[in-house]
A protein has these predicted regions:
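Glycosyltransferase catalytic domains, chiefly GT-A lineage
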Residues: 1-222
Length: 222
């Protein structure tokens, strides 16, 4: 639940929460100015296609139930969201406005629904989907470009539109730079970015020794 403490950053009017397994491709500052009603969050849908057929995923996670199959995307009318899976979000990118009210709302839900919370497969995003079930503004896919979307929904994906890539499932830094099946292109983008930063760690305010200890030590295949 640590990442949900972003709702406690009361000194900020708005926060864009981003997971660490992502690669920024283009500026996303417009998310700080995007209209958002009080008490709402903004996030992209979860892809429920389960292309690797992971047996521990919910049984309803199938391509026919995936919200990304809906057109237009994102849906203009919430009446299109006819299945529970259509309202699931991926919490890789969440636009939120921190407040005591929102923090208490989340905390209260956890305390009042312990059995449901215990069944969550993806705790933080399942919780947010429940708490904000009618208060989510759906972001376009490119603000949280799940790498599997490129294969699961090729009609939706456009490389030029991607703002940030989300390396769900297998991580390029754990697999090494070798080709990775259908994800080779997206993984190579991460490795290119890594190589650029590794060559000039001073751009991050790091010495080469600091880079080796804090970053390179955790990357395989180099």
């Amino acid at each position: 639940w640590t990442k949900l403490r972003a709702f406690e950053l009361y000194e900020y009017e708005r926060v864009v929460m981003i997971d660490s397994d992502m690669l920024m491709c283009h500026n996303m500052d417009e998310l700080f100015d995007r209209p958002l009603e009080r008490g709402m969050i903004a996030a992209a849908l979860a892809c429920t296609c389960n292309p690797k057929q992971i047996p521990t995923y919910p049984a309803e996670w199938t391509p026919r139930n995936c919200g990304y199959a809906l057109r237009p995307h994102p849906p203009n009318d919430t009446r299109q969201l006819t299945k529970p899976t259509h309202r699931l979000i991926n919490s890789g990118v969440v636009v939120l406005e921190p407040s005591q009210e929102q923090h208490d709302k989340i905390h209260t839900f956890i305390l009042q629904h312990p059995e449901r919370v215990a069944q969550y497969r993806f705790p933080d995003q399942d919780l947010l989907a429940d708490v904000y079930s009618e208060r989510v503004q759906m972001l376009p896919w490119h603000y949280n470009a799940l790498k599997t979307l490129r294969q699961c929904h090729p009609d939706l994906w456009n490389d030029d539109e991607v703002r940030i890539i989300h390396y769900i499932l297998d991580k390029p830094w754990l697999l090494g730079p070798a080709p990775c099946g259908g994800h080779t292109h997206l993984h190579s983008l991460w490795w290119n970015a890594y190589a650029s930063l590794a060559a000039h760690p001073a751009t991050l305010g790091m010495t080469r020794d600091e880079w080796a200890k804090e970053v390179a030590l955790h990357v395989r295949g180099i």
